[in-house]
C-alpha cells in the first residue's frame, strides 16, 4: 500500500492527496503532527533519498530557525536530529510506493507519479 507522509495543512500534501484520490490510488496518510516521524522510516529515507533532498531549506519552519539550529543541520546526523525534532523541515510529501515499487519520492510531481504508476 502507498503511504503518504506529511502534514495535512501543507498545500503540496493537499495537492498530492487529491491527485492520488483522483487517480484511484489507495493510500494511507501518516500525519507528522499527530503521529510523529518514525525514526526507522526517516533512516530509510535518508539512505534512499539523502538528507540534502529531505531537508526543506525553503520552508517557513527552516526560515524561523535560529542560525545555531540551522548550523546543526549541515550534515546527515545533524539533519536527522533536526528532522526528528522539527518534522516540518522535512520536504513533503514523502511517499512510500510499496514493496517492489521502487522506494520513495519526495515532493509532488504529477508527471513523475503518473509514470511511476505506469499510466504515463
Enumerate the language-model features and the residues they cover.
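Local sequence-structure signature of Cys/Sec-based thiol-disulfide redox active-site neighborhoods
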Residues: 1-23, 27-35
Amino acid at each position: 500500500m502507498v503511504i503518504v507522509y506529511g502534514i495535512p495543512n501543507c498545500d503540496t500534501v493537499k495537492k498530492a492527496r487529491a491527485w492520488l484520490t483522483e487517480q484511484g490510488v489507495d493510500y494511507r496518510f501518516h500525519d507528522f503532527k499527530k503521529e510523529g516521524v518514525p525514526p526507522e522510516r526517516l533512516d530509510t529515507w535518508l539512505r534512499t533519498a539523502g538528507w540534502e533532498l529531505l531537508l526543506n531549506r525553503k520552508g517557513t519552519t527552516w526560515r524561523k530557525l535560529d542560525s545555531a539550529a540551522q548550523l546543526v543541520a549541515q550534515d546527515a546526523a545533524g539533519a536527522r536530529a533536526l528532522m526528528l525534532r522539527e518534522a516540518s523541515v522535512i520536504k513533503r510529501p514523502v511517499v512510500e510506493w510499496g514493496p517492489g515499487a521502487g522506494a520513495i519520492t519526495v515532493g509532488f510531481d504529477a508527471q513523475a507519479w503518473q509514470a511511476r504508476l505506469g499510466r504515463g
